Amino acid sequence: MTVENINDVEFGEELASFTPDTSLENCSKFARAVGWGGPRFESHEGAQKEGFPGALVPGIMGMGFMTSTIHAWAPSAKIEKIDTIFRAPMIADTASIIGAVVTDIDSDEGLVELDMTIKNDAGETRVLGTATVRIPSSP
């Protein structure tokens, strides 16, 4: 369901999950675009030489995927804050599933709190966090 205004939001509502493109090619392009090019983002072998299990999905890219999930659910929302904890690396070429659930609604202020996760295809939580989102009170 697409949220138009704060009255459309339901406590406990789960946002539609999102599986972004975490291919090595996409992660490499993103890393270079933000000035983070290097083996850990551009090559599985290079990342392994640095002690990682494979090439990494840049952390800010994962946060971007979280914001995409929010805006797909509520296109007119303004994201006030996203707070994340990176529990384990996100690995390129591995499915990442972004999920979120509404955990608080302040109708007077037009604010919604979301608990968010990024899990891999084995169901392991790689990133977790919360988002505070301002949603219009009327369409």
Indicate residue ranges for each PLM-predicted region:
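Well-ordered beta-strand positions in beta-sheet-rich domains
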Residues: 19, 81-83, 128-132
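A generic structural signal for short beta-strands and their flanking turns/coil linkers
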Residues: 11, 18, 26, 37, ...
